[in-house]
């Protein structure tokens, strides 16, 4: 059996795409074929073009903000040089870029001189936002419309090959991308605009219509990304935005973009299940409406719970986001630069590998990461009569449920965090919790699913005991055999369409398992189209207490649910000893040689376990405010020039 060898860098192939278009300005005889961001652009993105692709080969794209006060410093005089440079760099480096045109507090001062009211607020945390425009002013609307219209004209003046590098445009209608008019409340009640109020929501819809007219309802289309249109990144609490949801789903003709930030910032935070149930159906093998999702890794990785084991947390954050169907992971400079030194760049390569696996018939890879979350909101699995009233504030209920799984390693390290919202959790939580309110309870998957996991195997947490900065990324969650209870097999099936047909084909399987018992035996069986499953590999453990990767290529895989319980694959216990598994991966074709693997050992680094909680300007309602002028996220000289 050949062990997979380690590799620290692998660049996904970039799809060659021929783009034909009709230009917005002037006469053209072409048609444009692109619909939505290229799948090859899905993966980790840089915030700006700050990092060399040779040093950070996992980068798939970069953002470029074009604030109004930088572009139009004088009325009617436009300086598009910053956007031109960004598009040129994307083209030159064979990557993608997304654009945004921030107004709000980035409105140029001359606009106020034209008669737009200047709004100050009672906010004391955002010194960089001293005032805002009154968005409902007819003068503001006229000038803002002119600015966005001129931006569209300039974008569509680019050559077709450069336009193709613009993956999408983020629609920003208010203050930053938060889709709120102001930070705080207006000091003059005449200009008050509650975020959920009809006036502000109507203004947002007007802006949506403007962007749609300029970028979506003409050729060439450029996809649009919206925030706060239904279930936002705070766990689906913004259903009040029904007006926006109805408008975009009825009027946007291209692929829709959404912000879905929570899941890529950690795992086991409140309301994960709400987010996944809301968006996953639009992101993975969608039928009807099609979406792509972008999220940010802000400063959450420097917070207490994340700093307990940065490598482990980045890995499970990537897994969590991929389970949702997230397309783009926008990573801060500090995290980008620390990734190589601190050993978590593997998570970025892993995310790149799977982010574009959207449609099963064309996907090349699938995974199932074994996991169980104890969702104490679930009254069916955990009846109130046995465990107590189902309320997020009922910590005793969470403790009772966790106690039922304590023999498998389940624990709660920070009880106080259970009652927090997910934004506050990622800022202030100080320990790992295996129970949570509406956390994701099943395995994390992308196109590969386990059949009846709780009936056929056991969940396992903290495989080698209490989690430390040196714990393996795989120690966090796992599943295993329990021979004494008859749980000796795990069955898996691929998403319908992945196999394509019933003909034998070449497929490669990778299984990550923990060698905990000397002499333990298990095997990997698969559906080869016969009446009984065929064995791909037999493994005997050495008991070295380490995680191992077993990779095998099979030449006659049929994978049409012909195995036991309708499975394509099965991990089978072949003795009375129990084995533990972390993840199963399927690849279309031959296995990768060399393969992508994490570092052999997880090492504590200088400053670990010293994450800081929220401070001024970083409250539990808003989450992390980006401070790019702070150490670790400085804007550096462009290295891609």
Question: Which residues does each predicted region cover?
Answer:
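Extracellular carbohydrate recognition and processing domains
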Residues: 531-563
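Glycan-recognition and processing domains
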Residues: 388-497, 594-614
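Substrate-binding cleft/loops of secretory-pathway carbohydrate-active enzymes
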Residues: 170, 175-181, 192-196, 202-289
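Short, surface-exposed beta-strand/strand-loop-strand elements in extracellular ectodomains
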Residues: 519-532
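N-terminal substrate-binding region of glycoside hydrolase catalytic domains
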Residues: 34-135, 292, 298-305, 326-336, ...
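An active-site-proximal structural segment forming one wall of the substrate-binding cleft
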Residues: 91, 128-170, 203, 207-210
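Substrate-binding cleft of secreted/luminal carbohydrate-active enzymes
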Residues: 102, 253-434
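Extracellular beta-strand ligand-recognition surfaces/modules
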Residues: 550-582
């Amino acid at each position: 059996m050949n062990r997979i060898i380690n590799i620290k860098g692998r660049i996904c192939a970039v799809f060659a795409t021929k783009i034909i278009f009709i230009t917005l300005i002037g006469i053209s005889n072409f048609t444009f074929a692109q619909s939505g961001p290229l799948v090859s652009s899905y993966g980790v993105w840089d915030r700006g073009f700050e990092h060399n692709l040779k040093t950070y080969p996992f980068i798939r794209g970069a953002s470029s903000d074009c604030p109004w006060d930088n572009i139009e410093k004088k009325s009617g005089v436009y300086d598009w040089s910053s956007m031109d440079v960004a598009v040129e760099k994307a083209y030159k480096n064979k990557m993608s870029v997304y654009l945004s045109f921030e107004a709000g507090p980035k409105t140029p001062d001359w606009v106020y001189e034209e008669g737009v009211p200047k709004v100050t607020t009672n906010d004391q945390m955002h010194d960089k936002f001293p005032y805002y425009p009154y968005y409902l002013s007819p003068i503001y609307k006229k000038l803002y419309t002119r600015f966005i219209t001129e931006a569209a004209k300039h974008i569509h003046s680019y050559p077709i090959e450069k336009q193709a590098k613009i993956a999408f445009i983020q629609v920003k209608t208010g203050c930053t991308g938060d889709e709120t008019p102001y930070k705080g409340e207006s000091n003059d009640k005449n200009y008050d605009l509650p975020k959920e109020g009809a006036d502000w929501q109507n203004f947002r819809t007007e802006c949506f219509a403007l962007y749609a007219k300029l970028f979506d309802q003409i050729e060439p289309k450029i996809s649009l990304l919206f925030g706060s249109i239904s279930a936002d990144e705070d766990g689906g609490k913004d259903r009040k935005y029904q007006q926006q949801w109805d408008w975009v789903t009825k009027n946007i003709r291209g692929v829709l973009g959404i912000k879905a930030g929570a899941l890529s910032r950690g795992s086991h935070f409140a309301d994960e299940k709400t987010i996944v149930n809301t968006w996953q159906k639009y992101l993975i093998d969608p039928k009807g409406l099609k979406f792509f999702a972008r999220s940010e890794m802000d400063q959450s990785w420097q917070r207490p719970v994340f700093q307990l084991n940065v490598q482990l947390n980045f890995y499970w954050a990537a897994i969590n986001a991929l389970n949702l169907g997230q397309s783009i992971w926008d990573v801060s400079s500090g995290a980008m630069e620390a990734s190589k030194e601190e050993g978590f760049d593997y998570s970025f390569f892993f995310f790149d590998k799977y982010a574009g696996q959207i449609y099963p018939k064309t996907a090349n890879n699938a995974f199932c990461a074994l996991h169980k979350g104890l969702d104490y909101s679930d009254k069916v699995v955990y009846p109130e009569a046995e465990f107590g009233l189902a309320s997020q504030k009922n910590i005793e209920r969470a403790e009772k449920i966790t106690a039922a799984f304590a023999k498998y390693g389940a624990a709660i390290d920070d009880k106080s965090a259970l009652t927090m919202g997910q934004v506050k959790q990622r800022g202030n939580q100080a320990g790992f919790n295996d129970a949570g309110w509406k956390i994701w309870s099943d395995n994390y998957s992308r196109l590969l699913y386990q059949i009846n996991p709780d009936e056929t195997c056991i969940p396992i947490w903290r495989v080698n005991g209490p989690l430390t900065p040196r714990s393996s990324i795989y120690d966090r969650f796992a599943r295993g055999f329990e021979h004494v209870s008859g749980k000796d097999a795990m069955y898996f099936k691929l998403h319908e369409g992945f196999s394509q047909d019933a003909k034998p084909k070449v497929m490669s399987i990778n299984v990550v398992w923990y060698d905990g018992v000397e002499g333990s035996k298990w095997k990997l069986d698969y559906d080869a189209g016969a009446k009984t499953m065929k064995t791909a590999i037999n493994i005997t453990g050495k008991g070295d207490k380490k995680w191992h990767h077993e990779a095998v290529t099979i030449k006659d895989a049929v994978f049409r649910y012909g195995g036991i319980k309708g499975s394509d694959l099965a991990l089978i216990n072949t003795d009375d000893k129990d084995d533990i598994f972390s993840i199963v991966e399927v690849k279309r074709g031959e296995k990768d040689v060399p393969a992508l693997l994490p570092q052999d050992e997880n090492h504590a680094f200088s400053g670990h376990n010293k994450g800081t909680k929220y401070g001024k300007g970083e409250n539990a309602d808003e989450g992390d405010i980006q401070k790019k002028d702070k150490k670790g996220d400085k804007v550096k000289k462009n290295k891609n020039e």
